[in-house]
C-alpha cells in the first residue's frame, strides 16, 4: 500500500514537472504578446497613431525601439543627449516611413534639473503619448571594487539609472493615465536580479528598477497602464562592450523585435510580476538559474568573471597609453 502511494506521488510529481517545462516552452516560444494596436499603433494609416517616447534613442537598443515602434505605426518622441544624432534619427524615420511624425528633445540626463524636465513636459503636452520606453542607462567604465570607485561615477550611475528614469516617468505617465490605456517599458538587467560583484552600483541601480517597476505596475494597473521590466542579459551595444552577436548575445534589432512581440507575457520570468525576459535564450537562462543554481555559487562565478573583465580592461588601457 505504501509503495503504491509512493509510486503515485512520484508519478504525479514527474508529470507536474514535465507539464511545467512544457508550459515554460509555450510561454517562451509560442504564446503571443499583446498587440501594440491596444495602445494606439496604426500600421495601416501611418501618422494617425498615437506617440511613443523613447529615452536614449540615438544608439543601440533605444534606437531600435524608436525605429521598430515607428514601423509598427507609432509617431516618435526621441529623447537623448546629442541634438545632432537626434536630428539624424528623426530624418531617417520620416524618410523611410512616410507619414510617421517625429519630434525630439536633447537632454543630458546626468545634469538635467527641473527646467529640463519642464521643457520635456511642454514638448509633449498636446501629444497623445501612449508608450514610454525608459531605455537610457549608464554603467561602470570597467568593473571595480566598490571601495575603490570614483564618487562621481557612483553619482552618475544613480542619477541616470534611477533619478532620470523616475523623473521622465513622472512627466509622461499622466498622459497615459488620461488616455485610459498605455504602456511603460523599463530596461532592466540580469545584474539587478542576481547582482554582480565589482559592478555593485550598477547592479544596485537595476535592482531598484525591479522593485520600483513592480510597485509602479500595481499602482498603474488600476488606470489600465501596463508596466513591464524588460529583463536583459548581454546585448550587442557600446554599454555591454560586446561587438559580436551569438545565440546568447542578440543584436539590438533582434532583442527589440522579441520584446515588442511578447508584451504582457513573462516568458522566462514566470512568477515575477510585471517582468518580462523577452529574448528566448535569455528567457531559458533566467528560468534555469532561478530554479537550479544556488545564489552563493552564482555570486562567486560573477565575481570571477568581473575580475577577469577588469584585468583585460586594464591591460587594454595600458596598451593604448603606450601607443600614444
Curated annotation (Swiss-Prot):
<keyword id="KW-0560">Oxidoreductase</keyword>
<comment type="similarity">
    <text>Belongs to the short-chain dehydrogenases/reductases (SDR) family.</text>
</comment>
<feature type="active site" description="Lowers pKa of active site Tyr">
    <location>
        <position position="206"/>
    </location>
</feature>
<keyword id="KW-0812">Transmembrane</keyword>
<feature type="binding site">
    <location>
        <position position="170"/>
    </location>
    <ligand>
        <name>NADP(+)</name>
    </ligand>
</feature>
<keyword id="KW-0443">Lipid metabolism</keyword>
<feature type="binding site">
    <location>
        <position position="237"/>
    </location>
    <ligand>
        <name>NADP(+)</name>
    </ligand>
</feature>
<feature type="binding site">
    <location>
        <position position="108"/>
    </location>
    <ligand>
        <name>NADP(+)</name>
    </ligand>
</feature>
<protein>
    <recommendedName>
        <fullName>Very-long-chain 3-oxoacyl-CoA reductase</fullName>
        <ecNumber>1.1.1.330</ecNumber>
    </recommendedName>
</protein>
<dbReference type="GO" id="GO:0141040">
    <property type="term" value="F:very-long-chain 3-oxoacyl-CoA reductase activity"/>
</dbReference>
<feature type="transmembrane region" description="Helical">
    <location>
        <begin position="2"/>
        <end position="22"/>
    </location>
</feature>
<keyword id="KW-0256">Endoplasmic reticulum</keyword>
<dbReference type="GO" id="GO:0030497">
    <property type="term" value="P:fatty acid elongation"/>
</dbReference>
<keyword id="KW-0521">NADP</keyword>
<feature type="binding site">
    <location>
        <position position="206"/>
    </location>
    <ligand>
        <name>NADP(+)</name>
    </ligand>
</feature>
<dbReference type="GO" id="GO:0005789">
    <property type="term" value="C:endoplasmic reticulum membrane"/>
</dbReference>
<keyword id="KW-0472">Membrane</keyword>
<keyword id="KW-1133">Transmembrane helix</keyword>
<feature type="binding site">
    <location>
        <position position="202"/>
    </location>
    <ligand>
        <name>NADP(+)</name>
    </ligand>
</feature>
<feature type="binding site">
    <location>
        <position position="235"/>
    </location>
    <ligand>
        <name>NADP(+)</name>
    </ligand>
</feature>
<keyword id="KW-0276">Fatty acid metabolism</keyword>
<dbReference type="InterPro" id="IPR027533">
    <property type="entry name" value="3_ketoreductase_fungal"/>
</dbReference>
<dbReference type="GO" id="GO:0045703">
    <property type="term" value="F:ketoreductase activity"/>
</dbReference>
<comment type="pathway">
    <text>Lipid metabolism; fatty acid biosynthesis.</text>
</comment>
<dbReference type="Pfam" id="PF00106">
    <property type="entry name" value="adh_short"/>
</dbReference>
<feature type="binding site">
    <location>
        <position position="53"/>
    </location>
    <ligand>
        <name>NADP(+)</name>
    </ligand>
</feature>
<keyword id="KW-0444">Lipid biosynthesis</keyword>
<dbReference type="InterPro" id="IPR036291">
    <property type="entry name" value="NAD(P)-bd_dom_sf"/>
</dbReference>
<feature type="binding site">
    <location>
        <position position="116"/>
    </location>
    <ligand>
        <name>NADP(+)</name>
    </ligand>
</feature>
<feature type="binding site">
    <location>
        <position position="135"/>
    </location>
    <ligand>
        <name>NADP(+)</name>
    </ligand>
</feature>
<comment type="function">
    <text>Component of the microsomal membrane bound fatty acid elongation system, which produces the 26-carbon very long-chain fatty acids (VLCFA) from palmitate. Catalyzes the reduction of the 3-ketoacyl-CoA intermediate that is formed in each cycle of fatty acid elongation. VLCFAs serve as precursors for ceramide and sphingolipids.</text>
</comment>
<feature type="active site" description="Proton donor">
    <location>
        <position position="202"/>
    </location>
</feature>
<dbReference type="InterPro" id="IPR020904">
    <property type="entry name" value="Sc_DH/Rdtase_CS"/>
</dbReference>
<dbReference type="InterPro" id="IPR002347">
    <property type="entry name" value="SDR_fam"/>
</dbReference>
<keyword id="KW-0275">Fatty acid biosynthesis</keyword>
Amino acid at each position: 500500500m505504501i509503495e503504491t502511494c509512493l509510486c503515485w506521488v512520484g508519478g504525479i510529481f514527474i508529470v507536474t514537472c514535465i507539464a511545467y517545462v512544457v508550459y515554460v516552452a509555450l510561454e517562451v516560444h509560442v504564446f503571443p504578446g499583446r498587440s501594440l494596436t491596444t495602445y494606439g499603433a496604426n500600421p495601416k494609416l501611418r501618422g494617425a497613431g498615437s506617440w511613443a517616447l523613447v529615452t536614449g534613442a540615438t544608439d543601440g537598443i533605444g534606437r531600435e525601439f524608436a525605429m521598430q515602434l515607428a514601423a509598427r505605426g507609432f509617431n516618435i518622441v526621441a529623447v537623448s543627449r546629442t541634438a545632432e544624432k537626434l536630428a539624424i534619427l528623426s530624418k531617417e524615420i520620416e524618410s523611410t516611413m512616410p507619414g510617421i511624425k517625429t519630434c525630439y528633445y536633447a537632454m543630458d540626463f546626468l545634469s538635467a534639473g527641473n527646467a529640463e524636465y519642464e521643457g520635456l513636459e511642454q514638448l509633449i503636452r498636446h501629444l497623445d503619448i501612449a508608450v514610454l520606453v525608459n531605455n537610457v542607462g549608464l554603467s561602470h567604465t570597467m568593473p571595480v571594487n566598490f571601495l575603490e570607485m570614483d564618487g562621481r561615477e557612483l553619482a552618475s550611475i544613480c542619477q541616470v539609472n534611477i533619478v532620470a528614469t523616475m523623473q521622465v516617468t513622472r512627466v509622461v505617465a499622466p498622459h497615459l493615465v488620461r488616455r485610459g490605456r498605455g504602456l511603460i517599458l523599463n530596461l532592466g538587467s540580469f545584474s539587478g536580479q542576481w547582482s554582480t560583484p565589482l559592478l555593485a552600483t550598477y547592479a544596485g541601480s537595476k535592482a531598484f528598477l525591479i522593485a520600483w517597476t513592480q510597485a509602479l505596475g500595481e499602482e498603474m494597473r488600476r488606470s489600465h497602464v501596463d508596466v513591464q521590466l524588460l529583463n536583459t542579459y548581454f546585448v550587442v551595444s557600446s554599454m555591454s562592450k560586446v561587438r559580436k552577436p551569438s545565440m546568447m548575445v542578440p543584436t539590438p534589432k533582434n532583442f527589440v523585435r522579441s520584446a515588442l512581440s511578447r508584451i504582457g507575457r513573462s516568458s522566462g520570468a514566470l512568477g515575477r510580476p510585471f517582468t518580462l525576459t523577452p529574448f528566448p535564450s535569455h528567457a531559458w537562462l533566467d528560468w534555469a538559474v532561478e530554479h537550479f543554481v544556488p545564489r552563493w555559487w552564482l555570486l562567486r562565478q560573477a565575481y570571477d568573471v568581473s575580475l577577469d573583465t577588469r584585468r583585460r580592461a586594464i591591460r587594454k588601457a595600458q596598451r593604448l597609453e603606450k601607443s600614444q
